Every structure is written in C-alpha cells, then in structure tokens.
Design a protein with these regions (language model features):
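Rhodanese-like catalytic fold shared by cysteine-dependent sulfurtransferases
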Residues: 1-19, 24-62, 67-100
Length: 100
C-alpha cells in the first residue's frame, strides 16, 4: 500500500469493509473535537508500541490524525516496523470533513 490515501479512496475502502481504521489523534485533540471518522477506533499515538501488536494483519490499516502530518507519520513508521500494511489519510480529519 502507498504511504497515504485520499479521503475519496478511504470512502471506497470503507464501503467495501476491507480496512481497519484508526483515529490516532493526540488525547487533547480528540478531547477538543471528539467527532471522528465513523467506524474508527481511537488509539493513543503515544502508546503505539503497546497496542501495535494487537492489530489484525488480514486487512490494511488506515490511520488519521488532525491534519495528516507528524502524528500520522510517526505512528505509521512504528506500525510498519511491526510489518503492518499502514497508510494515513492525506490531510487527516480536516480533509475528510472537507470531502463530505
């Protein structure tokens, strides 16, 4: 899988049901704006080493943060280090919201 995915591509994956979607926004960002992408499971990006091994390997993993920047990139790197197929949403939650 590529490094990033567009909101449009994510819509397609979600419709097919063939993706594990994770909200990796920092705690403070999530508390300030709790509404995320429907179907996503929140995981604390600061604790990626503790939950990364629990992710299913049979489906690709898509992650998102607020803007698709450093948080997504660092979580992606950590999960790829665990041999997971991981992409993140270009522009993060902001781009997803703008695409609706």
């Amino acid at each position: 899988m590529a490094d990033t995915i567009t909101p449009s591509e994510l819509h397609t994956l979600l419709a097919a049901g063939n993706v594990t979607l994770l909200d990796v926004r920092r705690c403070a960002d999530r508390a300030a704006a709790p509404q995320g992408i429907p179907g996503a499971t929140w995981k604390d990006p600061e604790l990626v080493e503790s939950w990364g091994d629990e992710l299913p390997r049979e489906k690709p993993v898509v992650i998102y943060c607020v803007r698709g920047g450093s948080v997504s990139s660092s979580v992606q790197s950590a999960l790829r280090g665990k041999n997971l197929d991981v992409t993140f949403v270009e522009g993060g939650l902001a781009a997803w919201d703008a695409s609706k």
